[in-house]
Amino acid sequence: MSQESNDDSLGIDKLSVDYDYLLYKIADYVSSIEFQTNQICKRQNELITKDIVNGIVDENIKHFREILTKCEKLENYFDMLDQINMITENFKTRLAQVARDYKELQKP
């Protein structure tokens, strides 16, 4: 077994990369939601100031529903983070037990 495969036999590097990617996706979603919300609000303000309101309410509701869908996806990502936290806590506990068992095996 090479040193490299031995160093990451538990897949910690992959978990770390997956975790970083999940955080990136969350940040990207937040930025996207923020941008879309600002755009809709600016557009709504323009429409109100120009008295062009006919038919716009339904379109705005559609856009806000799209944002709500993105918020739900964002909530799912946060749920994934919670699951990762539970997995890592469980992993730490199991790893500590393995270390204790190993020490017991080393006793004469």
Swiss-Prot record:
Main location per UniProt? cytoplasm
Domain of life the protein comes from:
Eukaryota
Compartments, record wording: Cytoplasm
Which Gene Ontology CC terms are recorded?
BLOC-1 complex; cytoplasm
Leader sequence segment: none
Extract the coiled-coil ranges from the record.
none
List keywords of the entry alphabetically.
Cytoplasm, Transport
Q: Which biological process terms from the Gene Ontology are attached to this UniProt entry?
A: endosome organization
What is the similarity comment for this entry? Belongs to the BLOC1S4 family.
Under the heading PANTHER family, the entry gives: BIOGENESIS OF LYSOSOME-RELATED ORGANELLES COMPLEX 1 SUBUNIT CNL1 (PTHR39145:SF1)
Functional summary from the UniProt entry: Component of the biogenesis of lysosome-related organelles complex-1 (BLOC-1), a complex that is involved in endosomal cargo sorting.
Q: What do we know about how this protein assembles, alone or with others?
A: Component of the biogenesis of lysosome-related organelles complex-1 (BLOC-1).
User: What's the protein called, per UniProt?
Assistant: Biogenesis of lysosome-related organelles complex 1 subunit CNL1
